[in-house]
Structure formats: structure tokens, C-alpha cells
């Protein structure tokens, strides 16, 4: 599968052919929410469109996806949804799906709007992650996995590992892995997700669930989700207006 050229090894044409089934070609981006913790920056602007260091937050993710040759990208919008159309100037291939239920429901309601898009291997990403290492979006994926980094203690959503697979998904823990909002799901697991999301959403209070809790907690037995470990600095999570100001100040100084 490898050929040597000018003292460098490259994947041969036959090797690339073998990799084709594992090439990721689709991504879904969750961008419907209000981002209340970022007020006043989000008073008139969706959090993913807030500018940091000369670039809008979502553009760092979009650029990473494009670098991995992924252009089948659907963005689920809600709050100030018309503003996302400005992205088409640089990313004309984007598709938009509206979720007006974001006001009263959790992000599982966004996934319910794109069940028909879960018919092949797919990245599912949060839109408000400031990606500093584009390499975390890999062109090829071989199994379902979720991005995370090790931490001794956290109050955020996290998980532990059992034989390299995600277990004990909860908010807050010690000696665990902090969840980053980028995951990949195989074609087979996407089909399972379609079924499980619909089942959980139909339950009382189902609309108040985080979608990630469906495969990682409520229906965990149906999946084997591997950790794809990254470094904390690969993504900057901006969870408050104060954190936004601090990052902008670092850029100025």
C-alpha cells in the first residue's frame, strides 16, 4: 500500500482505493442554541458566529472539515438563523436545517431534525468549539468514537474507559476524560442512532435530554464507542463572556 518517492513514503493508488470505504464525507453541526452564558456577545449574534482572533468560531471547525475534504455539511440552526447564511460566501456547499424547538427542548431536538442524514458514516459536531488543531478532524475513520482529553477532576460532561471504550457517562467525575463535542459514527451506528433517538425523544421528558446521552448512557448497550484522545489545547471551549474577553486580551497582548 506504500510506495517510496524521493525518500518519502506515499500511499499507493491501490492503497487509496482500499481506504475509500473509511473516508468520511459527511458532517452535521449543531448550532441552534442561544448561548446565554456568552451574553452580551450573543445578544444579537449566535455564539458560533462570534469572532475570536479575527475568525468566527464556527469557521475554525469548517476549515478543519474542508481540509479533510468533507463538504457534505449540514448546520442545524435556530437562534438568529438568518445570520448563518453569511457563511455561504466562503462555504457555498453548506446546507441548513432549522430547529425552532431549541427554545423549549434540549439538543436532542436538533438531531430529530436530521434523522434522514444519518444514513452513512458521519461526524457530529458542536458549532461553538474554537478549533486550534485542525488535525483532530481526520479524513479517515474506522469505528465510532468521541473526542476527549484526560483530566483528574471535572464538573463538565465526561466519561471513563473500559477496554478503550466509553463508559460511565455523566456530568462531573474524577480520573476521567472530558468530552469534547466532536464524535464520529459509522454507517451501522448511525442507523442505530436513528432508532434510539426516536425512542428516547418519545418518552416523557425525552425532549430535555442531551443527544449524546442516548448512545453513551440510555442505550449504551447498543454501541461500542472508542475514545479518540486529544490534547486540551486542541480545542478552546469558550463557555462564558469572561473567557471570551480573556482570549481576546491574549491576542491583543
Each model region followed by its residue ranges:
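Short beta-strand-to-loop acidic/aromatic patch adjacent to the donor-nucleotide binding site
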Residues: 121-130
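Conserved core of the sugar-phosphate nucleotidyltransferase
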Residues: 132-205
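Phosphate- and divalent-cation-binding pockets in alpha/beta enzyme and binding domains
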Residues: 37, 60, 83-86, 113, ...
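Conserved alpha/beta core of the MobA/IspD/sugar-nucleotide pyrophosphorylase nucleotidyltransferase superfamily
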Residues: 4-27, 180-253
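Conserved beta-strand segments of alpha/beta enzyme cores
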Residues: 48, 93-95, 224-226
Amino acid at each position: 500500500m506504500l510506495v517510496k518517492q524521493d525518500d518519502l513514503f506515499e500511499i499507493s493508488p491501490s492503497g487509496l482505493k482500499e481506504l475509500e470505504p473509511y473516508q468520511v464525507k459527511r458532517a452535521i453541526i449543531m448550532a441552534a442554541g442561544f448561548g446565554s452564558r456568552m451574553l452580551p456577545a450573543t445578544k444579537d449574534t449566535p455564539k458560533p458566529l462570534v469572532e475570536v482572533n479575527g475568525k468566527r468560531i464556527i469557521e475554525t471547525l469548517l476549515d478543519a472539515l474542508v481540509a479533510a475534504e468533507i463538504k457534505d455539511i449540514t448546520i442545524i440552526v435556530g437562534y438568529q438563523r438568518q445570520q448563518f447564511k453569511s457563511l455561504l460566501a466562503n462555504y457555498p456547499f453548506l446546507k441548513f436545517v432549522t430547529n425552532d424547538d431549541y427554545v423549549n427542548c434540549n439538543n436532542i431536538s436538533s438531531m430529530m431534525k436530521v434523522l434522514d442524514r444519518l444514513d452513512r458514516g458521519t461526524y457530529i459536531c458542536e458549532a461553538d468549539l474554537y478549533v486550534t488543531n485542525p488535525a483532530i478532524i481526520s479524513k479517515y475513520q474506522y469505528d465510532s468514537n468521541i473526542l476527549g482529553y484526560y483530566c483528574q477532576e471535572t464538573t463538565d460532561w465526561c466519561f471513563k474507559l473500559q477496554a478503550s471504550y466509553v463508559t460511565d457517562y455523566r456530568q462531573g467525575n474524577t480520573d476521567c476524560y472530558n468530552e469534547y463535542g466532536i464524535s464520529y459514527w459509522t454507517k451501522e451506528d448511525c442507523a442505530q442512532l436513528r432508532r434510539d433517538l426516536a425512542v428516547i425523544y418519545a418518552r416523557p421528558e425525552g425532549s430535555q435530554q442531551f443527544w449524546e446521552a442516548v448512545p453513551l448512557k440510555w442505550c449504551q448497550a447498543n454501541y461500542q464507542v472508542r475514545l479518540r484522545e486529544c490534547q486540551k489545547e486542541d480545542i478552546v471551549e469558550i463557555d462564558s463572556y469572561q473567557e471570551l474577553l480573556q482570549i481576546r486580551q491574549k491576542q491583543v497582548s
